[in-house]
Amino acid sequence: MDIKINDITLGNNSPFVLFGGINVLESLDSTLQTCAHYVEVTRKLGIPYIFKASFDKANRSSIHSYRGVGLEEGLKIFEKVKAEFGIPVITDVHEPHQCQPVAEVCDVIQLPAFLARQTDLVVAMAKTGNVVNIKKPQFLSPSQMKNIVEKFHEAGNGKLILCERGSSFGYDNLVVDMLGFGVMKQTCGNLPVIFDVTHSLQTRDAGSAASGGRRAQALDLALAGMATRLAGLFLESHPDPKLAKCDGPSALPLHLLEDFLIRIKALDDLIKSQPILTIE
């Protein structure tokens, strides 16, 4: 099943789409700088591109952690991104009242993993009519995503994307089950499945409020996931990850973006040049 996002076709058998940007909006200047580099690289490589950032990180572990610029300022920044670069934008919402204002600016709205079973939020998102990206909760099996998909269908919206972002593996660790990509496709009507590689690299030190990460393994994990024939890759970068206000240890250094994507595109092109082989 393919989904249209403006002039972009998103489907498991179509060339992969990059959902990329920064974890959280820090300022207008840094946002435009990061987005400009993404646009330059993706246009050079011929990769369809959707800009990603959060206006509010409402689920930070510490009340003292940076959350973002807020809804009002965030929407202004997204409007400037769209006006300057002419690209679609995706951002996440956390409360039902945010859904309609965000949907009026952003092309895709995202359901956070921790909130994916919140029915009131699901219904409010569905009613916007926008394309919705559903983050798979760390605590759910891939097949359980079907229940969330059915909620959206009952609320009148079938324009859905499914996003893997890792599964809890004991305490303070995430792993990615490569078989889960196929399970989500099979149980959810072959909806587009994308892979959030940077959040899947998160770790946490016992007792720490801040997430750690394993960015050195980002390419290995991304290639493994994309080899399963996915619709897209979800990737966060930062000009200087050490200075990032959220999830810096998992962020790809921005200057490595082109070399990273060259390898991802080469694999995606190879995988999708071959016919699907069904093994019963």
UniProtKB/Swiss-Prot annotation:
Superkingdom: Bacteria
Family matches, as Gene3D superfamilies: Aldolase class I
GO terms (BP aspect): keto-3-deoxy-D-manno-octulosonic acid biosynthetic process
An example molecular function term from Gene Ontology annotations: 3-deoxy-8-phosphooctulonate synthase activity
SUPFAM superfamilies, per the entry: Aldolase
UniProt cross-references to Pfam families, sorted A to Z: DAHP_synth_1
DNA-binding is among the record's keywords: no
Pathway(s) per entry: Carbohydrate biosynthesis; 3-deoxy-D-manno-octulosonate biosynthesis; 3-deoxy-D-manno-octulosonate from D-ribulose 5-phosphate: step 2/3; Bacterial outer membrane biogenesis; lipopolysaccharide biosynthesis
InterPro entries: Aldolase_TIM (IPR013785), DAHP1/KDSA (IPR006218), KDO8P_synthase (IPR006269)
Sequence intervals crossing the membrane: none
GO cellular component, as recorded: cytosol
E.C. code: 2.5.1.55
Locations listed in the record: Cytoplasm
Keyword set, alphabetical order: Cytoplasm, Lipopolysaccharide biosynthesis, Transferase
Catalysed reaction equations from the record: D-arabinose 5-phosphate + phosphoenolpyruvate + H2O = 3-deoxy-alpha-D-manno-2-octulosonate-8-phosphate + phosphate
NCBIfam families assigned: KDO8P_synth (TIGR01362), PRK05198.1 (NF003543), PRK12457.1 (NF009109)
Family membership: Belongs to the KdsA family.
Annotated protein name in UniProt: 2-dehydro-3-deoxyphosphooctonate aldolase
Organism in which the protein naturally occurs: Neisseria meningitidis serogroup B (strain ATCC BAA-335 / MC58)
